[in-house]
Amino acid sequence: MIRSRFVRSLTLVLATFVALSCSDATATGPLAPSAAQDGLLSGLVGTVTGLLGTVLKVIGFQTDPNGIDVYAVRWAPTHVNAVRTVSATIGVNGGSLSIPGSDFTITFPSGALSGPTTISITSDASGYVSYDMQPHGLVFKKPVIVTQRLKNTSVYGTPIALNAFGAYFATDPLDLSGLLKALEIETTTIFSGSSGLPEVETWSLNHFSRYMLASG
């Protein structure tokens, strides 16, 4: 199961890289549905190129209705805390959105959505690597892929980077410090950069709403 999820994720990442190499468009606001297939890609070529490095680790999907103990990961001092939002309409042909200031991109494969859907992603100013993804409760027909760079996070260059993953919360935790209870740990693939350190990771998502970078 883990291998199958990884193959699907890697295939989509490689497809995203090919598309990015053909486009330098950035989604900074709502676009028409017809632009979703080839007009929403953000230009984070370096992010996806980094994914072509060595796979260091794959963290398998986990879920527990009673909650899984995790710790939210903070941004590093190099990151400027601010509320950043990107929104666009994505159709059945797929597309991508990015928040460059948060080193974040999300890619929807063709067929993930049943029809044109307005997608909105917000990176908050909490000081943690956390995102609100709307519409809340949206379920995908195919997994979508989040790409998160690690360089501006507090785990970069530490052993914790090899145990950092995407975590799902049904509601927005009021306090992100200390021990948290995640409902899911998403399938996470961690890649190295030229330095050999964990540089970037992908999360495979089956639904929205509240996700963050966390560690066990």
Can you annotate each of these PLM segments?
Residues 127-133:
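Short beta-strand elements of extracellular/lumenal beta-sandwich folds
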Residues 18-21:
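C-terminal motif of bacterial Sec signal peptides marking the signal peptidase cleavage site
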Residues 2-11:
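Bacterial N-terminal signal peptides that target proteins for export
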Residues 23-105, 113-119, 124, 136-139, ...:
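Proteolytic cleavage junctions
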Residues 105, 130, 145-147, 202:
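Beta-strand secondary-structure signal
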Residues 137-148:
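Contiguous beta-strand segments within globular domains
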Residues 108:
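B-type heme-binding environments
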